[in-house]
């Protein structure tokens, strides 16, 4: 896949980014370079390599799958200026 000038301009318009003609021309080369690198990555043989989300092992602490209120309601509203039964009260802004 390659990117042309029309594609860069279209993406810039969709993203609502002002791009000059010189910047758009430069981006064509940069984006094609990035896509070329991604294509190289797709050629790498990863057969037998275990998928991972991090380079360091991260063991997640297991907990019971039970519904609770979190027992944090008082802590959450502690700094609120006005509360009512652990709910935030806010001034009325719409008439």
From Swiss-Prot:
It catalyses: L-glutamyl-tRNA(Gln) + L-glutamine + ATP + H2O = L-glutaminyl-tRNA(Gln) + L-glutamate + ADP + phosphate + H(+); L-aspartyl-tRNA(Asn) + L-glutamine + ATP + H2O = L-asparaginyl-tRNA(Asn) + L-glutamate + ADP + phosphate + 2 H(+). The keyword Ligase applies. It comes from the Bacteria. Signal peptide: none annotated. One of its GO terms (molecular function) is glutaminyl-tRNA synthase (glutamine-hydrolyzing) activity. Belongs to the GatC family. This is Aspartyl/glutamyl-tRNA(Asn/Gln) amidotransferase subunit C. It comes from Rhizobium etli (strain CIAT 652). The gene is gatC.
